[in-house]
A protein has these predicted regions:
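Short, internal strand/loop/helix patches
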Residues: 44, 55-96
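Short, small-residue-biased leader/transition segments that mark boundaries at the very start
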Residues: 1-7
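Short secondary-structure boundary/capping segments
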Residues: 3, 35, 90-92
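Short beta->alpha linker loops
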Residues: 14, 49, 70-71, 118-121
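Structural microenvironment flanking redox-active thiols in thiol-disulfide oxidoreductases
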Residues: 18, 23-66
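Thiol-/selenol-based redox modules, centered on thioredoxin-like
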Residues: 93-127
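Hydrophobic beta-strand anchors of alpha/beta hydrolase catalytic cores
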Residues: 10-11, 43
């Protein structure tokens, strides 16, 4: 109290709206949003889904933070989180679930990698 709050962006990249893991992650961040804000974090989600999909995802899950529709894949490529994935033996291009903590000067302070992200407890990882 009385000191200036340092705002950090928690820019989290996720594969797809309405999927189980992405919904669990978004809802965990939603449920802990006030605690994240008190600690000086702004939460911003990014996926390659379009704005209409994001709006449905926000409304269905009552998300209090913005989602960026990176339909041209500029952000996922710039942050290095777009690449070949595989599921059930099928290879495809997709987003690696990754979170970047960016300070007020725009410098990446910390990266929570795809192997580290816990979708159901992600807010605690950020804090």
């Amino acid at each position: 109290v009385g000191s200036e709050m340092c705002i950090r962006d928690s820019l989290y990249f996720y594969p797809k709206d309405m999927t189980s893991g992405c919904t669990a992650q978004a809802c965990n961040l939603r449920d802990n949003y006030s605690e994240l804000r008190k600690a000086g974090y702004e939460v911003i989600g990014v996926s390659v889904d379009n704005e209409k999909s994001h709006q449905k995802f926000i409304e269905k899950n009552n998300l209090p933070f913005p989602l960026i529709a990176d339909t041209d894949k500029k952000l996922v490529e710039q942050f290095g989180v777009w690449g070949e994935k595989s599921m059930y033996g099928r290879k495809y291009m997709g987003t690696f679930r990754t979170t970047f903590i960016i300070n007020e000067e725009g410098v990446i302070e910390r990266i929570i990698t795809p192997k580290e992200v816990k979708t159901k407890d992600h807010a605690a990882q950020i804090l």
